[in-house]
Amino acid sequence: MKHLSIDLETFSATDLTKAGVYRYAEDPAFQILLFGYSIDGALARVIDLASGEQIPDEILAALTDAGVVKSAFNAAFERICLSAHLRRHHPDLLGEGFLDPAQWHCTMVWAASLGLPMSLDGVAKALRLDVQRSEEH
Protein backbone atom coordinates (compact mmCIF):
# COMPACT_ATOMS: atom_id res chain seq x y z
CA MET A 1 0.00 0.00 0.00
CA LYS A 2 1.42 3.35 -1.10
CA HIS A 3 -1.62 5.64 -1.03
CA LEU A 4 -4.71 5.81 1.17
CA SER A 5 -7.58 8.15 0.22
CA ILE A 6 -9.88 8.96 3.14
CA ASP A 7 -13.30 10.52 3.67
CA LEU A 8 -15.02 10.78 7.06
CA GLU A 9 -18.52 11.53 8.23
CA THR A 10 -18.46 12.65 11.85
CA PHE A 11 -20.60 13.85 14.73
CA SER A 12 -19.84 16.15 17.65
CA ALA A 13 -21.97 18.10 20.09
CA THR A 14 -19.56 21.02 19.52
CA ASP A 15 -20.34 23.36 16.63
CA LEU A 16 -17.43 23.05 14.21
CA THR A 17 -17.94 26.50 12.71
CA LYS A 18 -17.86 28.20 16.12
CA ALA A 19 -15.24 26.15 17.95
CA GLY A 20 -12.83 24.88 15.29
CA VAL A 21 -11.74 21.37 14.47
CA TYR A 22 -9.58 20.72 17.56
CA ARG A 23 -12.38 21.44 20.06
CA TYR A 24 -14.87 19.66 17.76
CA ALA A 25 -12.80 16.46 17.77
CA GLU A 26 -12.01 16.62 21.50
CA ASP A 27 -15.68 16.88 22.49
CA PRO A 28 -16.69 13.79 24.55
CA ALA A 29 -19.58 13.17 22.13
CA PHE A 30 -17.30 13.24 19.06
CA GLN A 31 -17.36 10.13 16.92
CA ILE A 32 -16.54 9.04 13.42
CA LEU A 33 -19.74 7.67 11.94
CA LEU A 34 -18.48 6.52 8.55
CA PHE A 35 -14.91 5.89 7.43
CA GLY A 36 -14.56 5.78 3.66
CA TYR A 37 -11.27 4.78 2.09
CA SER A 38 -9.57 3.63 -1.09
CA ILE A 39 -6.22 1.85 -1.26
CA ASP A 40 -4.00 2.79 -4.22
CA GLY A 41 -6.98 4.00 -6.25
CA ALA A 42 -8.97 0.77 -5.90
CA LEU A 43 -12.73 0.68 -5.38
CA ALA A 44 -13.73 2.71 -2.32
CA ARG A 45 -14.99 0.97 0.80
CA VAL A 46 -17.02 2.37 3.68
CA ILE A 47 -16.80 1.23 7.30
CA ASP A 48 -19.93 2.01 9.34
CA LEU A 49 -18.39 2.71 12.74
CA ALA A 50 -21.73 3.98 14.07
CA SER A 51 -23.14 0.46 13.57
CA GLY A 52 -20.21 -1.24 15.28
CA GLU A 53 -17.99 -2.06 12.30
CA GLN A 54 -14.24 -1.67 12.90
CA ILE A 55 -11.51 -0.10 10.81
CA PRO A 56 -9.39 -2.99 9.44
CA ASP A 57 -6.00 -3.52 11.08
CA GLU A 58 -4.13 -2.89 7.80
CA ILE A 59 -5.80 0.52 7.51
CA LEU A 60 -5.04 1.39 11.15
CA ALA A 61 -1.39 0.49 10.52
CA ALA A 62 -1.33 2.57 7.31
CA LEU A 63 -2.56 5.65 9.18
CA THR A 64 0.71 5.79 11.13
CA ASP A 65 2.99 4.40 8.39
CA ALA A 66 5.30 7.13 7.05
CA GLY A 67 5.59 5.18 3.79
CA VAL A 68 1.87 5.56 3.04
CA VAL A 69 0.62 8.88 1.67
CA LYS A 70 -2.78 9.78 3.08
CA SER A 71 -5.03 12.14 1.12
CA ALA A 72 -8.37 13.77 1.76
CA PHE A 73 -10.41 16.80 0.81
CA ASN A 74 -9.66 19.13 3.73
CA ALA A 75 -6.96 16.80 5.00
CA ALA A 76 -6.41 18.79 8.20
CA PHE A 77 -9.96 17.98 9.34
CA GLU A 78 -9.62 14.26 8.56
CA ARG A 79 -6.17 14.08 10.19
CA ILE A 80 -7.26 15.80 13.41
CA CYS A 81 -10.48 13.77 13.66
CA LEU A 82 -8.63 10.51 13.04
CA SER A 83 -6.02 11.50 15.63
CA ALA A 84 -8.76 12.00 18.23
CA HIS A 85 -10.36 8.68 17.26
CA LEU A 86 -7.05 6.80 17.51
CA ARG A 87 -6.21 8.34 20.90
CA ARG A 88 -9.56 7.15 22.26
CA HIS A 89 -9.89 3.76 20.61
CA HIS A 90 -6.32 2.72 19.69
CA PRO A 91 -3.95 4.57 22.07
CA ASP A 92 -1.20 2.04 21.37
CA LEU A 93 -0.98 3.32 17.77
CA LEU A 94 -0.67 7.04 18.43
CA GLY A 95 -0.33 7.81 22.11
CA GLU A 96 -1.24 11.41 22.96
CA GLY A 97 -0.07 13.04 19.74
CA PHE A 98 -1.48 13.70 16.30
CA LEU A 99 -1.01 11.98 12.98
CA ASP A 100 1.96 13.49 11.11
CA PRO A 101 0.77 16.26 8.75
CA ALA A 102 3.81 15.68 6.51
CA GLN A 103 2.27 12.34 5.48
CA TRP A 104 -0.96 13.96 4.22
CA HIS A 105 -1.91 15.55 0.91
CA CYS A 106 -4.91 17.85 0.78
CA THR A 107 -7.00 17.59 -2.39
CA MET A 108 -8.85 20.77 -1.39
CA VAL A 109 -5.56 22.68 -1.61
CA TRP A 110 -4.80 21.02 -4.96
CA ALA A 111 -8.23 22.04 -6.24
CA ALA A 112 -7.71 25.63 -5.08
CA SER A 113 -4.29 25.76 -6.76
CA LEU A 114 -6.07 24.92 -10.04
CA GLY A 115 -8.58 27.72 -9.55
CA LEU A 116 -11.40 25.40 -8.46
CA PRO A 117 -13.73 26.12 -5.53
CA MET A 118 -12.62 25.16 -2.03
CA SER A 119 -15.74 23.11 -1.33
CA LEU A 120 -16.30 19.52 -2.36
CA ASP A 121 -19.71 20.34 -3.83
CA GLY A 122 -18.24 23.32 -5.68
CA VAL A 123 -15.48 21.20 -7.21
CA ALA A 124 -18.00 18.53 -8.28
CA LYS A 125 -20.18 21.16 -9.95
CA ALA A 126 -17.24 22.91 -11.61
CA LEU A 127 -16.02 19.60 -13.03
CA ARG A 128 -19.58 18.59 -13.98
CA LEU A 129 -19.32 15.31 -12.10
CA ASP A 130 -22.40 13.10 -12.03
CA VAL A 131 -21.75 11.95 -8.48
CA GLN A 132 -22.06 14.74 -5.96
CA ARG A 133 -22.21 14.79 -2.19
CA SER A 134 -25.62 14.49 -0.61
CA GLU A 135 -26.99 17.66 0.99
CA GLU A 136 -28.06 15.53 3.99
CA HIS A 137 -25.31 15.24 6.60
Question: What does each model-identified segment do?
Answer:
Residues 30-32, 36-37, 41-58, 64-136:
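Active-site-proximal helix-loop-helix substrate-binding element of RNase H-like nuclease domains
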Residues 10, 136-137:
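Intrinsic disorder/low-complexity segments enriched in polar/small residues
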Residues 1-30:
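Entry/capping segment at the start of metal-dependent catalytic domains
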